[in-house]
């Protein structure tokens, strides 16, 4: 197993460390994920019955006779959304809830995502070997103390690395495991349950990828309740959100254009926003009042640009989204007669337009590397909506718990309250985190996406400005975590070690906590 191949290809040093050629990127992808209505084709739906409203987040299938259909995919690149539009023919109807690799789209455009953007970084596990992946059972047997023959010098160095001022040793947990042998090379308070800060995003990333799949795509749709007479739609247009955390103004503009393509020039009704896929709670449990908006925008199943409206974060993201759609419709030549509002669509409507997000793997990658709280919370609610029937944080963390338990993660002392780690109620142990990291390596279907969600020391994400001049640069990939009472760093050192450091205090010195973490990671990197 070459874990160095999981490092970033951004920067010369990282490319050398990872044994990757500079500028290498993903293979060209064809976009075949979305069928749009095209009024000019003057075709009919093939379905025998009227399209039904979705009972799950999978978009309704709109199979149209005729040739040119518009396909669209949004690409997240360091937080920037970009709309790619092309023309082509769908040879096989794609599964819009999963990666639509089955759908072949013949298009005059060849779209490559790679060297120009972080989201196109190629990072694959090469040469994975069985002994490299220690099982959770072995980890539990060994975690009580370092294995016989452990490098005493390394243990001493790791011990000294953690002993810094203003960080309580009694509230510091650390564990390092040799991936080649499965032996524990260092352990301190590994079973102690501590507040994990943003290390909470690790179980969320794993559960989302395991349950939804790396190719899963969110969708947002416009459904009409009414009839089209001439160029006038008599009725309302419903903007329905299904939890896409990356929905942006450009996507609404494209949706509005698709509505106009039906020949609609006036809506004799209103634009109504439906955010009922999630509950109405805007924050997570156990959050400090100051975290609202400052650390995460208000949570909603329907939010455009994270609820930004007229330069400010709206307390009602869905209503703001409806207003933005109305503006987009007017720009597309569609006038709307009534004022926007929110509501819940309970009747059968006609799907007029649909937007599909980039794959979940890209979204999780951004969430992990940039430690994005909003995305983490949206993923938790999505898990609850899809698998528990309730788009709530409580339902979502229950799904995460069940996923972890299902793969044998030791959950003694673990408590999951939210997705981001902002909650003071969250608890993880170093034992659980290292077991989760090893599970992420062992899962072939999600391994690449899980590993690529980690930041690279001295190269990108939340580790870009850390360990830049140490032996750990480009050798350590990890998830950071910082609040006023907690600090954490968990991840991998090349293909040799998996480690986790959790530190708590009231307050804790983030400065000294990070020094301890960096020394610990550097000692592991120097050990070879």
Residue ranges of predicted features:
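Active-site SXXK
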Residues: 182, 196-214, 271, 302, ...
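N-terminal targeting segments
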Residues: 5, 9-12, 16-19, 23-34, ...
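Short, well-structured active-site flanking segments
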Residues: 210-225, 333-342, 447-451
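Small-residue-rich helix-loop
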Residues: 185-187, 384-528
């Amino acid at each position: 197993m070459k874990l160095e191949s999981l490092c970033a290809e951004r920067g010369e040093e990282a490319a050398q460390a990872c044994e990757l050629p500079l500028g290498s990127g993903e293979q060209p992808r064809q976009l075949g994920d979305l069928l749009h209505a095209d009024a000019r084709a003057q075709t009919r739906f093939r379905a025998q019955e009227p399209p039904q409203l979705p009972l799950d987040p999978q978009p309704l299938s709109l199979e149209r006779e005729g040739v040119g259909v518009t396909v669209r995919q949004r690409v997240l690149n360091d937080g920037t959304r970009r709309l790619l539009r092309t023309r082509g023919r769908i040879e096989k109807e794609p599964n819009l809830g999963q990666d639509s690799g089955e759908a072949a789209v013949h298009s005059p455009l060849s779209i490559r995502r790679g060297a120009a953007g972080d989201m196109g970084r190629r990072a694959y596990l090469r040469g994975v070997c069985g002994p490299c992946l220690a099982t959770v059972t072995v980890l539990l047997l060994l975690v009580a103390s370092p294995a016989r023959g452990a490098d005493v010098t390394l243990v001493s160095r790791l011990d000294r690395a953690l002993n810094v001022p203003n960080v309580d040793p009694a509230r510091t947990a650390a564990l390092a495991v040799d991936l080649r042998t499965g032996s524990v090379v260092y352990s301190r308070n590994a079973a102690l349950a501590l507040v994990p800060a943003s290390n909470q995003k690790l179980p969320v990333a794993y559960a989302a990828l395991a349950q939804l799949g790396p190719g899963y795509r969110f969708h947002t749709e416009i459904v009409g309740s009414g009839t089209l007479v001439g160029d006038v739609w008599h009725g309302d247009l419903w903007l329905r959100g299904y939890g896409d955390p990356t929905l942006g103004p450009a996507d609404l503009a494209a949706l509005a254009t698709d509505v106009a393509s039906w020949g609609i020039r006036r809506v004799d009704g209103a634009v109504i926003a439906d955010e009922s896929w999630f509950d109405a709670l805007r924050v997570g449990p156990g959050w400090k009042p100051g975290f609202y908006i400052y650390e995460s925008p208000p949570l909603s199943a329907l939010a455009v640009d994270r609820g930004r409206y007229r330069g400010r974060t709206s307390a009602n993201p869905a209503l703001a989204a409806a207003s933005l759609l109305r503006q987009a419709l007017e720009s597309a030549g569609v006038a709307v007669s009534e004022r926007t509002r929110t509501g819940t669509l309970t009747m059968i409507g006609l799907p007029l337009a649909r937007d599909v997000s980039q794959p979940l793997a890209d979204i999780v990658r951004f969430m992990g590397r940039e430690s994005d709280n909003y995305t983490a919370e949206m993923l938790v609610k999505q898990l609850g909506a899809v698998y528990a029937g309730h788009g709530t944080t409580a339902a979502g963390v229950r799904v995460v718990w069940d996923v972890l338990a299902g793969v044998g993660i030791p959950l003694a002392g673990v408590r999951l309250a939210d997705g981001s780690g902002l909650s003071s109620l969250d608890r993880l142990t170093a034992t659980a985190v290292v077991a989760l990291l090893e599970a992420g390596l062992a899962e072939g279907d999600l391994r690449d996406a899980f590993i690529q969600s980690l930041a690279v020391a001295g190269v990108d994400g939340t580790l870009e400005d850390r360990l830049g001049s140490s032996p750990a640069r480009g050798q350590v990939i990890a998830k950071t975590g910082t609040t006023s009472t907690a600090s954490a760093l968990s991840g991998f050192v090349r293909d040799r070690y998996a480690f986790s450091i959790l530190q708590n205090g009231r307050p804790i010195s983030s400065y000294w906590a990070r020094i301890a973490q960096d020394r610990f990671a550097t000692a592991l990197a120097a050990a070879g």
